[in-house]
Structures are given as C-alpha cells and as structure tokens.
Amino acid sequence: MRRAATRAFRTCQCTVRGHRSLSYRANRRGSYVHSSLLQSQIPAHNQQSLRFSFTSRAPIKHAHPVREPLQSSMNARRATVALLSGIVGYGAYYSYNGNSTDTAAALTRGFSSSSSSPTNPGDAIPTRSVLVIGAEELSTGTFVGEGPISKTTDDEGRAIVEMLTADQSSQKLRKMEESFLVNRGRGVVRYDQVQLPSNNPIEDDHAEKIVEVPVRGASESGSDWMFWGVFDGHSGWTTSAKLRQDLIRYVARELNETYKAGGNSPTSEAVDTAMKKGFTRLDDEIVHHSVQEVLKSNSRSVAAELLAPALSGSCALLSFYDSQSNLLRVACTGDSRAVLGRRSENGKWTATPLSVDQTGGNPDEANRLRKQHPGEEHVVRNGRILGGLEPSRAFGDASYKWSKDIAEKLRQSFFGRSQSPLLKTPPYVTAEPIVTTTKVQPEKGDFLVLATDGLWEMLTNEEVVGLVGKWLETQSNAAPKSQFDSVWTKIFGASQKNGLPVEQGTAATGGDGQKTPIRVRQWGISNDDDRFVVKDSNVATHLIRNALGGKNEEMVSALLTLPSPYSRRYRDDLTVQVIFFGNGEKAQNQSEEVVINKDATAPPKPLKAKL
C-alpha cells in the first residue's frame, strides 16, 4: 500500500489593528451605501491652506488610541471614491453601474517629492510630510514641529497622520515576508510569500505543506506532494483561518484514498474528483455539520465558536504539485488567481493563467447559476449573486446555502442573520473548485504565482510574470554567495534587458469577468514599464511594492500610511506566493531539506522582558 505521511512547512495568521471606518458604496457582501464624490479641486493659489504648520511651541492635541473589536466587513470591490491632494496629489475615480465599470481620471497631477527636513538649513524645527484624512477627502501636506503627530486632529476634525518615510515603507512591506530554500531534489528549489493587511484584522490567510510519499521498494524512489494555498476571506477572518488549518489535510486525505484505490496510478479525472471532494467535504463541515452541533448543544458560546466560519466566507486557491509526474494541479474556488511563468525560446517569459475568476460577472458562472435556478431573474444581479455576494464560489457564506427553516431557527435561537428575500432555492454558492492540470518543466525554470484578487486589481498577468522575470535577472546577475546561488543561476540564467522580459498577451477588458488593474486607473498613474523597480530580496514583496507604485516612493508611502479601514478604499488585503521549480540537488541532512532564506525573510520579533 502506498501511504502518504504529511510534513508541514509553515502556516501563518497575522492580526493588525486600525482606525474608524468611512462609508463606502458597496462591500463584498453587497450592502450598498451611497457615497458622495468630492469633485472640487483646490486652485493653485489656495494650496497653501492645506499646509498645516504646527510649530513646537504650539500646543498639539493627541487623541488617545481606540482599540476596536474585530472588523467583519469586506469593503468596496467597486467603489465611488476620490483622492484629493492639496500640495501633492494623485487620483482618479471610477463608478460602478450595473455590470459595467466606467473610469475617468481626475486630479492627476501626480506625486512629487515632499520635504521631510527643515525648511532652511539653519532651522532647528523639522518639516514632515503628513496625510490629512477627512470624512470625504484624503490630502497630503506638511507638519512643522518635533512632537508626535499620529492620531492628531485639526480644528475641522480631520485626522493628521505622519507619512511613512521610504525606509519605514520598506519595513512595513517586509514585515510579513518569508522565503524558504527547498533542497529536496524533487522539482522545487524555493518559494517566497508575503502578506500586507488592509482590513483590520487581515482577512487573508495562507498555508503550505509537503506530503511525503514513501517508497514501495528498494528500486523505486519516493515522491513529494507539495501544496501551496492562499485564502481570501470576506466578512471576517474566521473562514480563511479554518481553511489554513484544514483544507490541505482534507484534500491530502482524499488524494491518498484515490491513489490507494487506483493502484498508485489513478486517472486524471479521479485525481480532480478527489480534490473537489476535499473542498466540498470541508465546506459541508463548516456550513452544515456545525449547525447540527450547535442545535444539539443549545449554547450561545458554542454557537459563536462553531458558526463563525459559516457566517463569514472565503475564496480558496490551492496548488498541488506531484514531483513524480511533474503535474501541477490548481483548484480554484472564488476569484484568487494562479499564473504560470515559463521562459520562451527568445528568452522572454510567457504568462499562462491556471485559473479563472469565479464571480457573478463571469458569463460562464452566471449561465451556470441561471440554469441551476430557472425562473429566478435576480439570481445574478449587477454582477453579484442575488445582488449581494461577488464570488460565485466560496467557502462559508452560509446565508446563501442554508434553507429558510434552518436560517430562521438559528436566528431565533442564537444570533444568525436574516436571509435575502430573493432567496428561494438555496444553495446559490458552492465551494466546489474548478481544477486545471499543467505539466511543469523544472528544467526551464518555470515559476508559479498565487495571489488573492487584490494583486490582480493592480497588475496584469503579464506584468506580474514580467516583474518576476526582471527580479530573476537581478538575482542571477549578482555574485553567487552560496552553492544555492550557483544552482539558481544555472536554472534561471543571467541577462540584462530594458523593460519587462515578458511576451505581451491580449489586453484584458474585463468583459469575461476577469479582474483588470482598476486601481491603476483609480490612482491616475501611468501603466508603462518605467514605473517598476527592483529593490527587494523577496520576490513576493517585490510584486507588492510595484503594485503599489514601484519607483514612485511617495505613492507607495501614502498607500502604506493609510490606516485601516480607510485604506480599504484604495487597496485590498494582499497575499502573494511565488514558487520556483527547478532540478536542484538533494541536501545530505534532512534538517537542511527546507531551510529559511534569511536574506528574504523578516527577522523574528525580539522577545520582550516580562518584568
């Protein structure tokens, strides 16, 4: 019998805290709130009015930090916003109407360099850049003085937050980065990952694991089942945390049974079915088995614990690589995305999507739902399920899956929410994934990018692959510092080119429901390759930096300075994993088979004294 023994790489969950929320037009769950668009522009001769000059002699009022309970709302996927700047500004807005997205640039003067030093060489009082956050505006200005200014408010109630410097921005970007060197000689040589919160706490999560398949006989070599997954939560973090804990285990168990039943050579259809069963069985436990346990216990505390993953929701993107066959399977539930990068004969990289964004705006998904629910004209409305939920496939989201009887019983006995009056024949949302299969070519240096949808709102598939390719060129041209660096150069080569080394594909329009870089239009910035930069050792961090502005350090700093949940109007939670395939050598010692790449991993937090 061929049995699979699991070995965990690393899993991670991080929490951050932030500030008070503003109103948005629509959140992911679909409740609409009208938001006015600030269309006034400050004339050039009045821009000085947005310069806040507080000297060290002037009294400064400090607001006390307020700790909030866990936020549960996943805010605007499509929002009407305005980004207004007085001294230095950027912005654009786009409005959402029905299934179309209209974009118009406004206030596009662009970021310029701002002062963070004394106004005159002889001055002892520093001038610092600040963000001014109002109810309907965001502006930048300067603050003169030496005292702390975070959480300070002016006479009009606007919060004034000191802008992060370039170094502080890099520290924030790299705070949650991790990198691992894989020296198992089985097709994978390295993987990098990073997270950047926007919600408070972050609603994304991720998981990684090796399932080691032992040898059957002396003449056979073992193989690895390698898993990487990103989970994009909405309406809270509890569902994505549940997936981090259990999804790989459920899928590996189904795969193990399938391989045993198929004599270690199951059909491709059987493997796909096993992955789908792992997904749907876990969702059944989250949505339905939890209800049975809650009704048996008749306890509010038990209900609060067990129903939390059912009431919130999460997309899931899971990759499964079999080192023996070099087959890579990607199972997608929701709108996270996987893209494969492969070097072509001319030295450039090609970008191949391995998943499709599953939303109400995807024509195939909309047609599937209309066939499953005939006669229900509002099953997909404005690109959303029943006019509310954007992903058409997701874990949790029980209000779209429970029967009316169950939902009403839970609402009366505990604290469940009321269902939509449009709900007639649930379930409307499924966790069953779409599975794709690709033959990986480690000898060509293939790589895989997995990311939640926040990244794809800022970069195209080709830009992501080209950015990884550009980063690889920089790494390969550096002097080797170890045996791994020599192997790296052998696999990925070394070259120097201008622009991104990627084959350009057909420009995406969004008509097929696939996410396009709407944030670039929202921010009103150029979409040419000159905006990109290479300055990070972790390639996942490198992708996020360039998604936020790249060379434009002031834009990067502004987007990173924005406190949660206000930041959600301009960027989503971000989780990115990049896996590099290659025929590296196997380490002699088992303890060296998977090691932390310290050059691309955030240092551990120092231990604090208890006394």
Model-found features: residue ranges?
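N-terminal mitochondrial targeting presequence
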Residues: M1-E146, D155, K610-L611
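PP2C/PPM-type serine/threonine phosphatase catalytic core
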Residues: R67-P69, T103-F227, G233-L611
